[in-house]
């Protein structure tokens, strides 16, 4: 009964917490924290179940010990034992009453409460999509920050607070996720890591023959026919009855025979070409991939000494706003052209926590606008959850909005709502423009406020590693610092887009990244930021 009450309490409390959470937990660390508490309560429920089972087992053990002692005496001299009428009565009673009662005790199912709890909460657990998304996130971090599988498996990441290692089965899960998505490059890397840990003697449920089955086909898909044959033969030495491996080996060997039939020169050239490109990370659609990722690693930043001399710090009072004359903000130049500045102590810790508190229940997978259709959709290159806050939601929202207006000298009347974003595992937003380009579907037409003239980005958390805001065309990288904000203009004074402001949010390697954005629009800024005398002013 006690267990049933506990289960009911657990169900009521966590049903309320998780019922509003959508799938795609991996896209928001904020939502994943709820899973920690859900798992903690499941452990408590499981411990209660174990206590009940142990108490039941203790009774059964006590009964068994007592019966063993009794039957050893009675079986030694059955007639003499039964000569005593009390013994005869007790034997009948035991077999008619006590043993059936013991049977009922054994048949009692103490797991019902725990199973009921697990079944209800399971509706809100991560899905296969979450697991594959989390696997992709780890591989994204692996590629962006040039981490080898062994480093990730040992959990040797910069800025980590807790030790975390990947088991053999964990590594196999990563390799299998890559395989299921046709990503044979990462399949090979992680299946090789599985073999390495198996050879080191680690325990696992996965078998070496299963790993070789995946690995041999993956290297074949990457064009390494000789190694595919070698691995398949190794698989068959472990499991001679493996039908698919036998068929694959015959197929691979036939392809090798066909290769040998080619001219020696062609074969040599082809072999060299294959080896040169073997196991290379596949190319994708993003032209500035190398530049973007090197900036994320802190490499390739083009902040030369000459440029650095142009950067200064100062106290900023806006356009002599009375509030800022009394308490100006510290302003630091991050880049000279286009001018990107950072402001310090823009939001207090209390304001940040309050905004996160009211934003969290509204978080939903962040979307992007399809440039062809103008329709909002989710995309693999933007991994985060976001919500939009109105001033009516809480006084702190109105207060922060006014502060951004004072700092920038721009009106927030035509600005978008305050967007709060929380990045998940490997959370990122690949290179993009904040403004709508002339060849795009007019993304802001329905707002009637013109294009996005400026971006005000608040950092609401520190990030232990990764998570920089980078500008690939500039070679600039800006690192998150809690309570600070960066600001830049997306449009030139002529109203044309400043294409140098193409930027990205790097994947979060370690930590939890919270930001909030305010996008100012053109309407209402005509006299606050008037046109210049030239097109590029």
UniProtKB/Swiss-Prot annotation:
| Cofactor: binding details | Binds 1 Fe(2+) ion per subunit.
Going by the UniProt record, its keywords in alphabetical order are: Dioxygenase, Endoplasmic reticulum, Glycoprotein, Iron, Metal-binding, Oxidoreductase, Signal, TPR repeat, Vitamin C
So which tissues is this one expressed in?
Answer: Expressed at least in brain, heart and lung.
Name its co-factor(s): Fe(2+); L-ascorbate
Question: Where in the cell does this protein reside?
Answer: Endoplasmic reticulum lumen
- Activity regulation, free text: Inhibited by poly(L-proline) only at very high concentrations.
Q: Which GO terms describe its cellular component?
A: endoplasmic reticulum lumen; procollagen-proline 4-dioxygenase complex
EC numbers on record: 1.14.11.2
Q: Which residues bind Fe cation?
A: 432, 434, 503
Cross-referenced SUPFAM superfamilies: TPR-like (SSF48452)
TPR repeat boundaries on the chain: 209-242
What residues does the Fe2OG dioxygenase domain cover?
A: 414-522
Write down the chemical reaction(s) this protein catalyses: L-prolyl-[collagen] + 2-oxoglutarate + O2 = trans-4-hydroxy-L-prolyl-[collagen] + succinate + CO2
Q: Signal sequence span per UniProt?
A: 1-23
Glycosylation sites noted in the Swiss-Prot or TrEMBL record: 117, 266
Modified residues annotated as N6-succinyllysine in this record: 482
- Residue positions annotated to bind 2-oxoglutarate are 513
Name the Gene3D superfamilies on file.
6.10.140.1460, q2cbj1_9rhob like domain (2.60.120.620), Tetratricopeptide repeat domain (1.25.40.10)
What SMART domains does this protein's entry cite?
Answer: P4Hc
Q: Which GO MF terms does the UniProt record name?
A: iron ion binding; L-ascorbic acid binding; procollagen-proline 4-dioxygenase activity
Tell me, in a sentence or two, what this protein's role is: Catalyzes the post-translational formation of 4-hydroxyproline in -Xaa-Pro-Gly- sequences in collagens and other proteins.
Q: How does it assemble?
A: Heterotetramer of two alpha-2 chains and two beta chains (P4HB) (the beta chain is the multi-functional PDI), where P4HB plays the role of a structural subunit; this tetramer catalyzes the formation of 4-hydroxyproline in collagen.
Family of the protein in this entry: Belongs to the P4HA family.
Question: What name is this protein filed under?
Answer: Prolyl 4-hydroxylase subunit alpha-2
Which organism is this protein's natural source? Mus musculus (Mouse)
């Amino acid at each position: 009964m006690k267990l049933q009450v506990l289960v009911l309490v657990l169900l009521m409390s966590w049903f309320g917490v998780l019922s509003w959470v959508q799938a795609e937990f991996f896209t928001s660390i904020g939502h994943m924290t709820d899973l920690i508490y859900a798992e903690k309560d499941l452990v408590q429920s499981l411990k209660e179940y174990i206590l009940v089972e142990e108490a039941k087992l203790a009774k059964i053990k006590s009964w068994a010990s007592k019966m063993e002692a009794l039957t050893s005496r009675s079986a030694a001299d059955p007639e003499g034992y039964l000569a005593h009428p009390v013994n005869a009565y007790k034997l009948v009673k035991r077999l008619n009453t006590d043993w059936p009662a013991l049977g009922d005790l054994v048949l009692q199912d103490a797991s019902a409460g725990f199973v009921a709890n697990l079944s209800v909460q399971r509706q809100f657990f991560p899905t296969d999509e979450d697991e594959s998304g989390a696997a992709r996130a780890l591989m994204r971090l692996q590629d962006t920050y040039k981490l080898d599988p062994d480093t990730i498996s040992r959990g040797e990441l910069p800025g980590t607070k807790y030790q975390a290692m990947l088991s053999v089965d964990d590594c196999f899960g990563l390799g299998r996720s890559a395989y299921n998505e046709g990503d044979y490059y990462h399949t090979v890397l992680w299946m090789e890591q599985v073999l390495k840990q198996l050879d080191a003697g680690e325990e696992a449920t996965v078998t070496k023959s299963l790993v070789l089955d995946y690995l041999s086909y993956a290297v074949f898909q990457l064009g390494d026919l000789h190694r595919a044959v070698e691995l398949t033969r190794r698989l068959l030495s472990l499991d001679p009855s493996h039908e698919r491996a036998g068929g694959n080996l015959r197929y691979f060997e036939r392809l090798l025979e066909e290769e040998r039939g080619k001219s020696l020169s062609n074969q040599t050239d082809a072999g060299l070409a294959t080896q040169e490109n073997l196991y290379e990370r596949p190319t994708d659609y993003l032209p500035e991939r190398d530049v973007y990722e090197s900036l994320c690693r802190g490499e390739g930043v083009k902040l030369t000494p000459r440029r650095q001399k142009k950067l200064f710090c100062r106290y900023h009072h806006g356009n002599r706003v009375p509030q800022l004359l009394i308490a100006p903000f510290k302003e630091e130049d991050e880049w000279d052209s286009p001018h990107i500045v950072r402001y310090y102590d823009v939001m207090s810790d209390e304001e940040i926590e309050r905004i996160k508190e009211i934003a969290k229940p509204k978080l939903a997978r962040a979307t992007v606008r399809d440039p062809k259709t103008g329709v909002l959709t989710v995309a693999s290159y933007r991994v985060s959850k976001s919500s939009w806050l109105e001033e009516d939601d809480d006084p702190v929202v109105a207060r922060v909005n006014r502060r951004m207006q004072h700092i920038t000298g721009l009106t927030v009347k035509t600005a978008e709502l305050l967007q709060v974003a929380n990045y998940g595992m490997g959370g990122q937003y690949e290179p993009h423009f904040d403004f709508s380009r002339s060849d795009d579907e007019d993304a802001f037409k329905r707002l009637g406020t013109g294009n996005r003239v400026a971006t005000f980005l608040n950092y609401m958390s520190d990030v232990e590693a990764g998570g920089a805001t980078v500008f690939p065309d500039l070679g600039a990288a800006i690192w998150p610092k809690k309570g600070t904000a960066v600001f830049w203009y997306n449009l030139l004074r002529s109203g044309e887009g400043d294409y140098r402001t193409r930027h990205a949010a790097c994947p979060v390697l370690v930590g939890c990244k919270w930001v909030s954005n305010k996008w100012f629009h053109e309407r209402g800024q005509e006299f606050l930021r008037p046109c210049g005398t030239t097109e590029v002013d």
